C-alpha cells in the first residue's frame, strides 16, 4: 500500500493488514510455526500445557452443570498442535467429548489448510468471522 500522504491507521487495522493481507500478510504467506518457522508455541514443545488446558476445560464444564451442548472455540489454532492434543485428552472424558462442539476461528487460508490436514477425521468446525461492527 503506497501513499504520498500520512494516514492515521488504527492499531487493529494495522495488525490486520500486517498479518492477513492477501498478498503480503505474515500468516498468509507461510506457516511460521515449528522448527522451520519463526517461532515454536508451547503445544509444540510439550503436551503438558494442552493437557492442563483440557483438564481445566472439563472441570469448568462440570462446574457449570455438565451442559449437553458446549462450544469450545480456539482462536488462531496455528498448526493445530493444541487442538490435536485437546481432542486426544477430551476423549478420556466421554460424556464431555459427546457434548463438546470444537471450533477453530482462523482467518488464514494457509493455516486453515494445515489445520485440516493435521485434524483429518476429527469433528472440528472452522469459522473465519465472529462479528462485524460495520
Q: Whereabouts are the PLM-identified features?
A:
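Rossmann-like AdoMet
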Residues: 1-75, 79-129
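Conserved small/polar residues in nucleotide/adenosyl-binding loops
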Residues: 131-134
Amino acid at each position: 500500500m503506497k501513499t504520498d500522504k500520512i494516514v492515521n491507521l488504527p492499531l487493529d487495522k494495522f495488525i490486520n493488514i500486517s498479518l492477513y493481507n492477501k498478498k503480503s500478510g505474515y500468516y498468509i504467506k507461510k506457516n511460521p510455526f515449528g522448527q522451520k518457522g519463526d517461532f515454536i508455541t508451547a503445544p509444540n514443545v510439550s503436551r503438558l500445557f494442552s493437557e492442563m488446558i483440557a483438564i481445566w476445560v472439563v472441570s469448568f464444564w462440570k462446574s457449570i452443570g455438565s451442559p449437553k451442548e458446549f462450544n469450545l472455540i480456539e482462536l488462531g489454532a496455528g498448526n493445530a498442535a493444541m487442538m490435536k492434543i485437546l481432542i486426544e485428552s477430551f476423549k478420556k472424558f466421554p460424556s464431555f467429548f459427546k457434548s463438546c462442539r470444537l471450533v477453530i476461528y482462523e482467518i488464514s487460508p494457509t493455516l486453515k489448510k494445515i489445520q485440516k490436514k493435521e485434524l483429518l477425521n476429527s469433528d472440528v468446525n472452522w469459522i473465519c468471522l465472529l462479528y462485524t461492527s460495520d
